[in-house]
Each structure stands twice: as structure tokens, then as C-alpha cells.
């Protein structure tokens, strides 16, 4: 093995085991079969007279097929006095170590370099970080890491500020949540109170007093929850006025339907005719504003078989018409031929035409009046007024049928004593 390779191996081995190179030796040329005791026995004759020593480790070199041993000597042993070669078992053993003169030359060159750069050995040790435990600084001198200390202090202050800010924000959020919940409760309570006041008007005083007790500035802070409810205050006499207005609004004139009495008295029918005449007079006095709201009454022409008939009390007729009403045969003749009863017939028709017809329910009633009988008059006077024909089959039939029917179509009605005259089916449809 060459000397530079052996020196490199010694430096690497000392650095790996943490040994001082100035006290270490590398012994090469030891045979492979040589034991540890035999190595120490051979070294005792060379190193023991110079001082104590210790064999630290051994290694096998494959290229040379020999062993190498790392030996540490005690302090005070001069390495220059150790021989570089000595005889041993299996051949010549060689010794490799650091020459002290080499170190002196290196140190001389290093000092010259540091002086030229303006550096010292302490600067080199600090830069190379060769001393893991630096000496404590003097208390009188300021600390060299004052910037780091200031940064730590500022970091602690910033953390405290952030913590306080977070606490203040959490408190504000809790207060806002409580205010929002209170506002929602008040709004719900106000809505329920309004509903109860609408149902029970007597509760307006309690609600008004409750709203008076509330703070006026309270609703200004709840802009996000909509408009505040208006205070409900009950005024004296408000309930009476509301009822009066309600009565005025609901006041409607409903038509009174007069129903025919089902009795058999003659006076009841007579009173009914008078009441109808009174209603016609009242309806004639209705103002135009009311008439405008009602639908116009339209008269329709009817056929001969469905003419309008008017029942008339015989007492209201003139005396000239009474003898003609004794029998139904005379009645039919007077209606068809237009005999001497035409003036009375015209009078009755004009009285019926002056009446404003009131929509009444037509019923078939049989009233027994003893020997008296009603006179069925034809209301032909109403045909003189303008009539509006309806479109349809009924209107066409009404136009096609002539107004004057032949006398053969009418049949004399048979009457029984003490009973009503028999009325044809066409006359009952009234």
C-alpha cells in the first residue's frame, strides 16, 4: 500500500471513531492468520519502551490480502521517535502517522493567510462550528441576538391582540344573536296580538298599553327584521262607530216577497190585490238611480192559448159588468165577441197595465167563494206597448199565431154550484 493511500485511510478512520490523529498510528503488513494477542506481543517490543499504547480496531485489506491495525498512544509520546518499519510475524510491518513537521509548516501557512484576511483563530472556529459549546457572553455586553428577542416579544404581543380581538367578536356575535332572537319573539307576539285583537276587539287596550311600555328606539335597531308593528290603541267609542259603519255598509234593501195566503176568506184575496197596488205605487216612486241598477222588464207576446189573464174582484167592476159575470158562457162570449162589456174590460186592462209587474211566484190556488165567481179578463191593452221578441222557437210561434182566435176554439166551462169554475190547462199555466 502506498503512503498517501495509507494516510487517507488513517484520517478517515480517526474521523470515523473520533480519535485524535496526532496520537494515532496505522500498522499495516499484518498477516491474516495473526490473532489479537500475537499483534500485541509484537508491538510490545517496539512501542512499550516509548510509552503505553492500545490496539483500538483491525481491518482487512483485500488488495494486499493483509490486515491493518489502528493503535492509540498515550500523551507525551513523540511520534517522530517511532520507527517506520520493524520485523514481525509473516514479514515486515510498516507504521504510518502524521509528521509533526508537516503540521508546523501547515500552521505557519495558515497564520499567514489569516493575517492577510484580517481574521483570527476564533473567527475560523466560529465559521467552521468546531466548538459546540461556546463560552457564555459577558453580562456587561449587549446580547448579540437582540433582534431575535425583539421578534419573540412582538410575536407574543400580536398573539395577545388576536386573542382579545377574537373574544370581543364572539361577544358581539352573541349579543347580536340575542337581539335578533328577541326581535323575532316580539314580532311573533305582535302578530299573534293583532290576530287576537281582530277576533276580540276588547283586547286593543291591553295591546296598546304593552306597546307604550316598549322603548321607542328599540325598533330602530331592528331594521333587518322588517317594519315594526304599528301600536294598537283603543279609542273611546271606537267599537260603537265600527258597528255603526258595519251596519251602514251591510244595510241593503231586500225585496219583500208577499206570498198569497192559503185561506178561504174573500177578504184575504181582496187585501192581496190592495197590497199589490200599493207595491206598484211604491215601485213607481223609486228614483232613477235605483232603477238604473235593475234590469229592464221585457214583456213578451204570447199566443192566444197562453195569454195573460188577470183575476179581478167582482166588487171592483162597474155594475154594468156584474150581470155579465153570472155564468161562464156569457164570460166567454164577452171575451170573444167584444160585446157591451168592452168599456169595463178596457178599464180593467188599463188598471192592470199601469201596475209595474213585480216578480212573484205564481201558484195555483183554489178558493171557494160560494156562489160568487171570478171574472177572467184578457189583458189585451198591454199589447199596445212595445214588446221585445226573444229569439227562439217560442217567439216564432208567438208571431205566427194570429191575435184574434176563432170563437170555435173556446169552449164553455162547466161550473158546479158552490165551487170554482173549471179552468182549462192553458189558463193554469199562469
From Swiss-Prot:
Q: Where is the composition biased (Polar residues)?
A: 261-270
Q: Where is the composition biased (Basic and acidic residues)?
A: 219-228
Show the stretches that span the lipid bilayer.
none
In terms of domain of life, where is this protein from? Eukaryota
Which InterPro entries does the entry link to? Answer: PNM8A_C (IPR049131), PNMA (IPR026523), PNMA_N (IPR048271)
Segments of this protein annotated with the region Disordered? 219-270, 313-364, 392-430
Q: Where is the composition biased (Basic residues)?
A: 232-250
**Family, per the entry?**
Belongs to the PNMA family.
Protein name, per record = Paraneoplastic antigen-like protein 8A
Amino acid at each position: 500500500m502506498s503512503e498517501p493511500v495509507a494516510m487517507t485511510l488513517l484520517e478517515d478512520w480517526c474521523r470515523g471513531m473520533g480519535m485524535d490523529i496526532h496520537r494515532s498510528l496505522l500498522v499495516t503488513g499484518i498477516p491474516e492468520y495473526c490473532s489479537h494477542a500475537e499483534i500485541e506481543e509484537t508491538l510490545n517490543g517496539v512501542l512499550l519502551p516509548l510509552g503505553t499504547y492500545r490496539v483500538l480496531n483491525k481491518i482487512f485489506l483485500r488488495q494486499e490480502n493483509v490486515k491493518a491495525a489502528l493503535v492509540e498512544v498515550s500523551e507525551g509520546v513523540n511520534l517522530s521517535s517511532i520507527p517506520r518499519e520493524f520485523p514481525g510475524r509473516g514479514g515486515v510491518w510498516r507504521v504510518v502517522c502524521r509528521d509533526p513537521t508537516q503540521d508546523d509548516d501547515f500552521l505557519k501557512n495558515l497564520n499567514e493567510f489569516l493575517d492577510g484576511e484580517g481574521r483570527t483563530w476564533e473567527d475560523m472556529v466560529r465559521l467552521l462550528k468546531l466548538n459546540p459549546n461556546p463560552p457564555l457572553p459577558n453580562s456587561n455586553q449587549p446580547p448579540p441576538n437582540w433582534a431575535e428577542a425583539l421578534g419573540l416579544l412582538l410575536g407574543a404581543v400580536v398573539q395577545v391582540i388576536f386573542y382579545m380581538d377574537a373574544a370581543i367578536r364572539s361577544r358581539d356575535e352573541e349579543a347580536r344573536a340575542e337581539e335578533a332572537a328577541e326581535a323575532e319573539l316580539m314580532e311573533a307576539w305582535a302578530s299573534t296580538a293583532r290576530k287576537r285583537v281582530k277576533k276580540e276587539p276588547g283586547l286593543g287596550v291591553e295591546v296598546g298599553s304593552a306597546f307604550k311600555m316598549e322603548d321607542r328606539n328599540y325598533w330602530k335597531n331592528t331594521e333587518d327584521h322588517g317594519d315594526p308593528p304599528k301600536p294598537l290603541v283603543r279609542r273611546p267609542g271606537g267599537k260603537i262607530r265600527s258597528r255603526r259603519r258595519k251596519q251602514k255598509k251591510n244595510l241593503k234593501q231586500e225585496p219583500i216577497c208577499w206570498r198569497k195566503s192559503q185561506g178561504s176568506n174573500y177578504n184575504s184575496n181582496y187585501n192581496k190585490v190592495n197590497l199589490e197596488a200599493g207595491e206598484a205605487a211604491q215601485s213607481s216612486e223609486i228614483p232613477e238611480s235605483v232603477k238604473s241598477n235593475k234590469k229592464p222588464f221585457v214583456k213578451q207576446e204570447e199566443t192566444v192559448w197562453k195569454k195573460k189573464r188577470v183575476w179581478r174582484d167582482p166588487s171592483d167592476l162597474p155594475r154594468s159588468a156584474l150581470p155579465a159575470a153570472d155564468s161562464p158562457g156569457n164570460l166567454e162570449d164577452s171575451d170573444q165577441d167584444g160585446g157591451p162589456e168592452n168599456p169595463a174590460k178596457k178599464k180593467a186592462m188599463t188598471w192592470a197595465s199601469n201596475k209595474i209587474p213585480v216578480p212573484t211566484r205564481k201558484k195555483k190556488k183554489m178558493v171557494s167563494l160560494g156562489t160568487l165567481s171570478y171574472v177572467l179578463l184578457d189583458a189585451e191593452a198591454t199589447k199596445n206597448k212595445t214588446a221585445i221578441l226573444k229569439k227562439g222557437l217560442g217567439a216564432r210561434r208567438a208571431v205566427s199565431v194570429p191575435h184574434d182566435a176563432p170563437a170555435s176554439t173556446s169552449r164553455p166551462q162547466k161550473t158546479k154550484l158552490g165551487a170554482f169554475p173549471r179552468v182549462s190547462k192553458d189558463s193554469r199555466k199562469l
